[in-house]
Amino acid sequence: MNQSAQLFSRARSVIPGGVNSPVRAFRNVDGDPFFVQSAKGAYITDADGRQLIDYIGTWGPAILGHAPQPVLDAVHAAVDRGLGYGIPAPAEVDMAEMITDMVPSVEKVRMVNSGTEATMSAIRLARGYTGRRKIIKFIGCYHGHVDSLLVAAGSGALTFGEPDSAGVPREMTQLTLTVPYNDREAVKKAFELHGSDIAAVILEPFPANAGLYFPQNDFLHFLREITLRHDTLLIFDEVMTGFRVAPGGVQQLYGITPDLTCMGKVIGGGLPVGAFGGRSEIMDCLSPLGPVYQAGTLSGNPVAMAAGLAQLRELLKGNAYERLEQLGARMEEGIREALKKHGRNYTFHRAGSMFCLFFTEEEVYNLESAQKASKKLFKSFFWNMLEQGVYFAPSPYETGFISTAHTEEDIDRTVEAVRISLSRLG
């Protein structure tokens, strides 16, 4: 039994399922996970010494690669000053100023400890600010494990939410309306029926937790227009896309100003961090200024702030975003050529350094279309890639991430692994 197998056996006796987050269990690929010993740059080394090119990047935060030296230096310096204070510290102010500079829609920001905390707090704030109860979310958009947002769709275009997890009472989701992403008519119907009681519309502007797909027919501008017309807040969950697809996220690319933005991942530099921010008049409803309570013992942790600041500063130096685009384009070109060579018209989506390969020849634009992709083909592809030393996400519904630490050689080696893996699919 190898080291990873031994560790997984031990883990299952003390950790539910042997993992601390479900996707890590490899259930979607019918296997057991490997355990990581270390990570540096674009590579991870597992407990048995195997080195892999990594395209998970801790699920998004590692935009500079693993353990970048500027971030390590900042963390070491911060640790020497103390691990946490529970008292305001300069780094919190520096981080808030950095975020408000990079994301113009954010006039004020509150730090939290995860993306889940950010979306949970933003929803509470939206309800407190508007005095309304209902929320619209989109099927396939993931906003953390918040009770009211763990909702699956029922039949029809518009449903009152049914819980998507045991332990979530139906009453917790009854105020959440779910509609298909990219479906204007469903959104219009929701506002026709409930417009006066809709506090907010929340979405991932690029849904990236059901594969990766994009708005069609000016969908994001449509949402901004209809929410303004109904005095409803528009919340962009840019935990995935923020500071990655562009310094200011998807909202910068599309020229849209949401009322609130949820952030995380990249702004932590690899440590646990989340944030939510928006217009001052909305944010000032938060305690201690306003009636909406939100708090956190470790919010604004000085070590996490130091890591995040160092990462953001590095991103703004030189040509990091241009570099990420070049690497992403190189991968896309290579994978598309490989698909063409093997006569497979599978759908490949990319936004800068984010990417996803769907094993379907149909267009993917929402969760329903994403679910038409072959899980059987994906599973075979995943294990073939891993055998060749390339680690893609162990789920057909996850996004891959490129970092500035990847090289052209890494990309070319990955494309060659894709070619070989496709040839083995039969």
From Swiss-Prot:
Pathway: Porphyrin-containing compound metabolism; protoporphyrin-IX biosynthesis; 5-aminolevulinate from L-glutamyl-tRNA(Glu): step 2/2. Its EC number is 5.4.3.8. It is found in: Cytoplasm. Its cofactor is pyridoxal 5'-phosphate. The modification N6-(pyridoxal phosphate)lysine is found at K265. It comes from the Bacteria. CDD domains: OAT_like (cd00610). The keyword Cytoplasm applies. PROSITE patterns: AA_TRANSFER_CLASS_3. It is an enzyme of class 5 (isomerase). It catalyses: (S)-4-amino-5-oxopentanoate = 5-aminolevulinate. Keywords: Cytoplasm, Isomerase, Porphyrin biosynthesis, Pyridoxal phosphate. One of its GO terms (biological process) is protoporphyrinogen IX biosynthetic process. Belongs to the class-III pyridoxal-phosphate-dependent aminotransferase family. HemL subfamily. Homodimer. This is Glutamate-1-semialdehyde 2,1-aminomutase.
